[in-house]
Amino acid sequence: MIHPVFCRAIYFIAVSILFICASSLAQSPFQFPTANHTLFEAGNESKFFAPTAPDKPWTSGSFGCVRNNGWRLHEGLDILHLQTDKRGEPTDPVMATADGAVVYFSTRPSLSNYGNYIVIRHNIGGLEIYSLYGHLSAIRPGLKIGESVKAGELIATMGRTSNAETIAKWRAHVHFELNLLVNDNFAAWFKKASSGERNDHGEWNGQNLNGLDPREILLAEHTQGTNFNLLNFIRNQTELCRVLVRATNFPYLKRYPMLVLKNPVAEKEGVAGYEIALNFNGVAFALMPRAESEIKSRAKFQLLSVNEAEQKANPCRKLVVKRGRHWELANDGLRELELLTY
């Protein structure tokens, strides 16, 4: 058995090597969380993504409405392992995707589908984004909440932990997400909205993290180089629907002021609500303040429009539903808006 002190020494050496490697690369906002970079090799996607079963396509390990014939969301990337020990267990180092600070980790795999997982907050051009790393076998010894980490710094070891179905050795992977935080008051909202249900992770519950597609981000960054801009990427999400909310003071506005648009009418008359563009995953990527004179309904939430082509392509979040000839906010859509504006 390897002595714990020696284990820590190995970690230190590994971190040092990773720092040297990272410093030799052109700096980009995000780096791969493991040494598996085959995403950039056309035709080799099956070497990067872990599918859900041997007979399923690699796309089932990618982001979006990729499971259950398009009706189940997978909110991240399942990145395949590259190395194993003698027992066939993954040993790949997992690294921070960008400079940031550890805001949460869980070492109780029975409490989450993520198993052991870490959440890191990053500030990219003034915009806060949160990376998540799931199914870890071990978190780096001594890692603390609040600790600063550098891009490429070792934070964990890949594993197969989960409280759901067993992850087979052949598809061992790290589950990787890039998210916007929905509401600082999540714990209070959850207690009210989900009476009797447990919330073991506070505001770092997966329901409070709205995912963007890391594959699209990494590919755009690879193609655009230093011209890549995360804010522009978010602002250019495909709109699923547009809603009007009669709420004027919710945390998302303060956390993401760069997503709030200008409206001279509301600036002059006062803000009575917000017109919000949502992508298929419920990410609010454009928020327009509206004056009372611009709002036609007294309803707390009003569905203004639906992009039917996008809803057909990506229906899995079930935010809207068509009843007869008319679209309505579905229960999941109403729940998302209740959380956003709580």
What is the meaning of each model-derived region?
Residues A26-N116, N199-Y342:
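Surface-exposed, glycine-biased beta-strand/turn segments
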Residues E89-T91, T97-R140, K169, H173-H175:
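Zn2+-dependent peptidoglycan hydrolase active-site motif and core
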Residues Y11-C21:
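Bacterial N-terminal signal peptides
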Residues M1-C7:
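N-terminal secretory signal peptides that target proteins for export/translocation
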Residues S112, Y117-I120, E147-G225:
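Conserved, short, structured surface segments that act as functional micro-motifs
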Residues L80-Q83, S131-R140, R160-E165, S195-H201:
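Short helix/strand-bridging catalytic loops that position acidic/His residues to coordinate divalent metals
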Residues T97, L143-K144, V149:
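Surface-exposed strand-loop junctions at beta-sheet edges and helix termini
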